[in-house]
Regions:
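A short, amphipathic beta-strand motif
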Residues: 80-88
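A short, solvent-exposed beta-strand micro-motif common in secreted/extracellular proteins
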Residues: 125-136, 230-234
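Low-complexity, glycine/proline-biased repetitive segments and flexible coils/loops
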Residues: 187-413
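Extracellular "spike/adhesin" assembly and maturation modules
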Residues: 1-69
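Short, ordered, surface-exposed loop/turn motifs in non-cytosolic proteins
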Residues: 89-104
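Structured interaction patches on ligand/partner-binding surfaces of diverse proteins
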Residues: 135-163
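Short, surface-exposed beta-strand/beta-hairpin micro-motifs centered on an aromatic residue
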Residues: 116-123, 217
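Short, acidic Ser/Thr/Gly-rich low-complexity loop/linker segments typical of extracellular
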Residues: 103-119
Length: 413
């Protein structure tokens, strides 16, 4: 409820009643900046509320007496009830807010307010602290509120939150959130984790064929999940392959996804690790496909650039025959916007093939085939790592690691 806030306290306007001496109509003329909550049956005690307690023609005091008797009869000694209500700055109920209840420094319970913004919590008598953590969809005014619970009594606490009607958030770690009722639509953009490049050390005669990794797939999708809890999983980037002998495929990245509690799903698939193919016949080796394709490699000094913006990988030098990793065929830009930030470049194939946008460049084995081959890691979300190859046994071949995925949401757009 709100107090009346007058600009001119106590001012009234008196108007003579026509034909009636010394009789006046009187009205307020205080020009309130806040009209306040009127005092009537609707705001004090509705008949429907009284009926819940088996009362008719009741006053508010009748209900309070009944509540006290109920608490004494039904609450064990040493236990009280905390009544938490979450409201906006105008006093309107805001439901679906998670409130943590602390005793000392420990969280003893997390509760969620109902649609009417209220929740009843039974607790042992004592001192508590209530906290609403930072929220995606709300600005939190009541960050930390003390509350004392008394034996067989009620403690009423209002906590203030302000809805953010239009917003955009990026998630780079797995998490969960609840979509409030006022958010009718979400636009989701997801990027899968990029794979890592393949690596080879000590294998001569151009065998095996070593390729860069593909970038993670991307997806933009609109969903409607008001009131649902959504769980986000961010796909990891594939870890680098770091060896001094033999040859190994790169590691796949991880899927990035959003799943609502009713099963609505947005999934961006992982980028694949680069391929290490025992290829003594000097044939081409295909790079892996993904959001953007990974570069292939087959011959000494041949190069294959990783793909960008959902495209296939491309040959940039050398003399061999190639089949490249294919891209998804649609843009990998942020929310699919023409000028949006670019993600999910493919990794380069050896010898020094460049990566796609943010994809790792391939490692160079150097003059006389005697150098370590150290590849650059991917540097943008969802990008694949480059391949690494050295011909000398005992030399280090380290492929490029893939970069983790990303998920972003927009609402109120």
């Amino acid at each position: 409820m709100f107090d009346r806030v007058p600009l001119y306290p106590g001012r009234v306007k008196m108007t003579p009643v026509s034909g009636q001496a010394n009789i006046y109509d009187m009205e307020r003329a205080d020009k309130p900046t806040q009209a306040g909550t009127p005092l009537n049956k609707t705001t004090l005690l509705k008949d429907s509320t009284a009926a819940l307690y088996g009362l008719t023609d009741a006053t508010p005091d009748d209900v309070f007496v009944l509540l006290k008797r109920y608490s004494e009869a039904n609450m064990p000694a040493g236990t009280g009830t905390l009544v938490i209500t979450t409201v906006d700055s105008s006093g309107n109920a805001v439901g679906g807010i998670d409130v943590k209840i602390f005793r000392g420094s420990s969280v003893i319970k997390t509760v969620r307010t109902e649609e009417d913004g209220c929740i009843f919590v039974s607790l042992s008598a004592g001192n508590y602290t209530l906290s609403i953590e930072e929220s995606v969809f709300y600005e939190i005014s009541s960050v930390s509120v003390p509350a004392e619970v008394v034996s067989r009594g009620f403690r009423f606490i209002n906590m203030v939150v302000s809805p953010i009607l239009t917003g955009e958030v990026r998630f780079t770690q797995s998490t969960a959130f609840t979509v409030p009722a006022f958010v009718k639509k979400l636009k989701v953009f997801a990027v899968g984790g990029g794979g890592s490049g393949a690596a080879s050390s000590g294998r001569n005669n151009n065998a095996p064929c070593i390729t860069g990794a593909s970038g993670g797939y991307t997806i933009t999708k609109e969903i409607s999940v008001p009131g649902e809890k959504c769980t986000i999983t961010i796909g990891a980037g594939g870890p680098a392959i770091d060896i001094t002998s033999s040859y190994y495929n790169g590691k796949d990245g991880g899927d990035t996804k959003l799943v609502s509690e009713k099963g609505v799903t947005v999934l961006a698939g992982r980028g694949l690790g680069g391929f290490a193919i025992d290829n003594s016949a000097y044939q081409y080796g295909a790079g892996p496909s993904g959001g953007s394709g990974g570069g292939s490699g087959a011959y000494e000094n041949d190069e294959a650039a990783g793909g960008s913006d959902g495209g296939d990988a491309a040959k940039t030098g050398g003399t061999g025959s190639y089949r490249y990793g294919y891209g998804q065929g649609t843009t990998t830009r942020y929310f699919g916007d023409t000028n949006g930030e670019l993600f999910s470049g493919g990794g380069g194939g050896y010898a020094n093939g460049p990566g796609g946008n943010g994809g790792g460049t391939a490692g160079v084995y150097g003059s006389e085939y005697s150098s370590d081959a150290i590849c650059l890691d991917a540097t943008t979300y969802g990008a694949g790592g480059g391949a690494a190859k050295t011909y000398t046994a005992g030399k280090r071949a380290k492929s490029g690691a893939g970069y983790q995925g990303l998920l972003a949401i927009k609402w109120g757009y």
